[in-house]
Structures are given as C-alpha cells and as structure tokens.
Amino acid sequence: MVSLINEAFKKTKNANRPALLTYTVAGDNTKKRSLEILKSISAYADICELGFPHNTPIADGGQIQTSAYRAIKNGIKINDIFEIAKKFKFSKKTTPIILMGYYNMIYQYNENKFIKKCKNSKIDGLIVVDLPYPENKNFSKKCKRKGINFIQLVSPTTSNER
C-alpha cells in the first residue's frame, strides 16, 4: 500500500523544496466552514493536518487552545471530524490528511473503532500528542495494519531511548 504522506515527501524532495504542512482545528468557525477552510488551504499544501479539539488541550499553544474552545462551543463531535475528512478526501484524493489530537478522545471512542473509522474516512496519518513511546506500541501496530501512518513527535528533550 502506497503512503500518500511518503509520496508527498518524495515529491517535495525531488523538487528540492521543503514540504508545506497546514493545520486547522475541525469545527472552528463552523463544521461547514471547516471543510471549506481545509479545501482552501489544501490548494497550497503538500499535507493537511486536521486537529480534533479537546477540552483540555495542554500540549497546544494559545491559538490552538482558543480554536479548540470555539469548535467545542460550536458543537463539533468526533463523528463530525470524520465526516469533514471523508468529504475532503472525496474531492482531494491525492492530498494526504493527518488527524491530530489527544488519546483520551480515542480511548473514549474505542481504539479499534476509531482506527477503523479513520480507515473508512481515508485518513492517511495520526498524530496523538499525549501517547509517547513505548506506550504507543500497540496503537501504532493497529494503525499500521490498517495502512495509517502513526506519526510520533520528537523534541530536543526526547531521550535516545524514546
């Protein structure tokens, strides 16, 4: 199975340019506008990230926290996010989309059900900001079996063991 994320990075490498990844929070402005915003920024992006808002986004900066708050206030639900992604992929089949968020929402939804829904919604990758190595091993394997890239975050303070 070909990874659209890998293909996007190969394409930009061959063009000798950095990849442009964009990010928007699902449900911020409205559910309908989220899809319009995602489609609009995808015209310039190699890869699009769609954040699923959380009520305690401790790993996010102020702007994303504010966006998440507005999205939750607007009534966005996880199934709405899958619907936004699915509609986006219907019109932008070759543009990779990555969902980014927190493990608590995945856990509450049910890991297996969440990953299956990602697959059915044509999600190319997942970033789960609060699921570090080695705790993410099983989740990562489940994603891989469904052809979904599990993307881990690394910072200057990340140990060599992680």
Model-found features: residue ranges?
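N-terminal positively charged helical leader segments and presequences
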Residues: 5-13, 35, 40-43
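Structural motif
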Residues: 43-45, 121
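Active-site-adjacent beta->alpha loops and helix N-cap segments on the catalytic face
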Residues: 2-12, 54-66, 73-86, 106-113, ...
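Hydrophobic faces of well-ordered beta-strands that scaffold small-molecule active sites
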Residues: 20-24, 48-50, 97-101, 126-128, ...
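Catalytic cores of alpha/beta
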Residues: 30-42, 158-162
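N-terminal small/glycine-rich loop or linker at the start of catalytic domains
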Residues: 8-28, 61-67, 89-100
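Conserved, mostly hydrophobic/aromatic
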Residues: 22, 41, 51, 118
